A protein has these predicted regions:
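Gly/Ala-rich beta-loop-alpha elbow adjacent to hydrolase catalytic centers
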Residues: 158-162
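Short beta-strand element of the alpha/beta-hydrolase
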Residues: 77-88
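Gly/Ser-rich "nucleophile elbow"/oxyanion-hole loop immediately N-terminal to the catalytic nucleophile
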Residues: 141-156
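Alpha/beta-hydrolase active-site loop
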Residues: 125-145
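N-terminal cap/lid segment of alpha/beta-hydrolase-fold proteins
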Residues: 29-76
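Short amphipathic alpha-helix adjacent to the substrate-entry channel of hydrolases
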Residues: 95-114
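N-terminal Sec-pathway targeting helices
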Residues: 1-16
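Serine-hydrolase catalytic-loop signature spanning alpha/beta hydrolases and amidase-signature enzymes
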Residues: 88-91, 113, 139
Length: 163
């Protein structure tokens, strides 16, 4: 019994030391050097037709609280697909390659698309990024009529930290 307590205590102590010793700047530098895409998709892969709203602010909390919104031409409000980028809360942004591929696919299938940017760990501690995404969704719901998509038909997805 003492052995189990010792092991569990050691694991907890290691976790606490790891959390206290976590260096956001070191992680950002490492990931930035690893994730430096040299290939950008051409403009036709991003959006073609309809309206594009890039770096649309959804909150005044941070200059990083913006989203990119793409709405195809349509007589009727269409569903909105929301992408939340990944990156372990330390890198990436709303204009990632995955977002560009999403725009290409969904524009051809009659969906509006939004890609949400949020504060990363270097700027604000968790759960700031999650709170930012909630703010973005409230903004998108409140402005659905203005931008021409249906506030009752949202889908949200993401990868890694965005999932």
């Amino acid at each position: 019994m003492k052995k189990k307590g010792f092991i569990i205590g050691g694991i907890c102590l290691a976790a606490i030391v790891g959390i206290l010793g976590y260096n956001h700047e070191a992680v950002r530098v490492v990931f930035h050097n690893v994730y430096s895409p040299s290939v950008k998709l051409d403009d036709s892969s991003k959006w073609n037709g309809g309206k594009a709203y890039e770096k649309l602010p959804y909150s005044e909390t941070s200059e990083n609280d913006y989203l990119d919104l793409y709405v195809p031409d349509s007589e009727e409000p269409m569903p909105l697909i929301i992408l939340v980028h990944g990156g372990g809360f330390v890198y990436n942004d709303s204009q990632s390659r995955q977002a560009q591929l999403m725009y290409r696919y969904f524009r051809d299938h009659g969906y509006a698309c939004a890609s949400v940017n949020y504060r990363l760990a270097q700027e604000a501690a968790f759960p700031a990024g999650v709170e930012d995404v909630k703010s973005a969704i409230r903004f998108l719901r409140a402005n659905a009529e203005k931008y021409g998509y249906d506030p009752e038909r949202f889908a949200i997805w993401g990868e890694s930290a965005g999932g």
